[in-house]
Amino acid sequence: MKKHSISYLLFSICCLLPNAIASAQSVTEKLKAIGMENIRYAETGECITVTFENNVYRSTYQGIGEAIDACLESNVNKSLQLVALENQIPQLCISLPDTLLNDYREEKISLMQVYAEMGISIDTDHAMKAVENAKEIENPSAWKVDVIVYPELFLKNNSLNKLYTYAVNLSPAIEMGLWKGGKLTAQVVFPIAAN
């Protein structure tokens, strides 16, 4: 009797463990596919915690929205905690319960209802403790160089003989993440037009 129960236990562990790992990895693969960086994940009980950093989308909130959409497309059957990073420092913790994920997949609720019912908090300590022992950072941003062009428009109304003084500039910049919280930026300003 003991042999059968031990073999049944080992069989169930061998069958369920790869599915749990595969579901967490499907989230990280989806996040990597949309260009997120500094991805780490950990599974604790009924929750998968994933950290990510948005360096692709200009708006932080658009990047978070794209990450949530990508996670909704994955085959996760547990609750999700997403931690949004900025320069490798945690900023937001987004909680997506498994019931919310299942209702969205079964088309019982819309994407707007998911956004309305998910939990958002600036308290990231509990989530970061869950991933502090994660193996490695996937798609790290350290020492990667980003080239960005910033357009600039200045309007000033401080003289009596002209209605406005203006300047139009292009400012290309090279940005590189160095370490947690550290970033190097080099920028040159090219004037295009001015009066």
Predicted regions: what they are:
Residues M1-L9:
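Bacterial N-terminal signal peptides that target proteins for export
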Residues A22-A24:
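Boundary at the C-terminal end of the N-terminal hydrophobic targeting segment
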Residues C47-N77, Q81, L85-C93, T124-N195:
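Transmembrane beta-barrel domains of bacterial outer-membrane proteins
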Residues T28-T51:
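Short edge beta-strands and adjacent turn/loop segments
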